[in-house]
Amino acid sequence: MIMIAVSLLLSLVLCLLLGVPYIQFLKKKNVEQYILELAPEEHAKKAGTPTTGGVFIISAIIISSIITLLLAEKMDTKALVILITLFFMTLAGFQDDYLKIKGRENKGLSPRGKLLRQILIALIPTLYAMQCYGSVITLGSKSFDIGILYPLLSVFIITGASNAYNLTDGLDGLATSVGIPAFLACGTIAFLSGHTVVAIICASAIGASLGFLKFNKPKAEVFMGDTGSLALGGLLGTLAVIGRCELLLAVFGGVIVAETLSVILQVSSFKLTGKRIFKMSPLHHHFELSGHSEVRIVKEFALASFVLSLAAVILHILI
């Protein structure tokens, strides 16, 4: 328990310390976010905001996790697999951001190219999990052998979480405010199940996210970019798979799941009927265009994430 707290505090401090000089560097190099023309009008004001803040978020997570795990004598293959997966997801996101910055428009990797990278990276923790758990998934105290479906489910969860987190990162402070309760639930379930390594890394993610909020709260000084969102989402999915709470991710990650479903429903509806269900997707843009302020949306989504995360922990205990 002490090491989990150490991991959180160390990551928080590191994120705050790394953030200031990195943002100054981004401003000096004119590393700016380009806003989609289809985005709500209010977002035009965000043009020129530095991006790739995920670099110092993930750096804080990796450094604090390694230090804490070494102090706790918990640095093992499981920890390395999680951190290596996080590193490569960060690289994929950074490549996407780099192409957008270089082209001075909001076009990075092609959707197919991005998905291929995510799938290949997701295979790392999937193969490790199969080596440890075979093809068995758990839900509380219950176990289910799903056979050949296991690797498909694992890859789907990790890539899905990565993309869902990315879709959620559309308002100042939204992704981190929604992500913190999700990582808290994942870490709590992992701790209760004896997966201390997963709990420690979850704590690092929470600490770094809290630190990043200082720079990303309205009006944001920096955006995490795909560097941060793809990596944090991929990390959440990876921790859920290795921490054996992959099914409960649908509950404690309910907000990012809803954001993703809103996009799927919007696109499907328009293709089939020519009509849109929402004013704009993802879901947070629908509320924006309905007259809700960014701050209100972030608070309400964060509250929803907290309630769902609490429900997931309770379900884990009761089932």
What are these regions (language model features)?
Residues 1-27, 57-95, 125, 129, ...:
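Alpha-helical transmembrane segments
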Residues 22-27, 31-40:
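N-terminal alpha-helical transmembrane segments of multi-pass membrane transport
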Residues 30-36, 132-136, 277-281:
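Peri-membrane helix termini and adjoining interfacial loops of integral membrane proteins
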Residues 95-103:
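Hydrophobic transmembrane alpha-helix segments characteristic of membrane transport
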Residues 102-110, 137-146, 293:
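Membrane interface segments of multi-pass transport proteins and intramembrane proteases
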Residues 116-124:
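Carboxylate/His-rich catalytic cores and anion/metal-binding grooves
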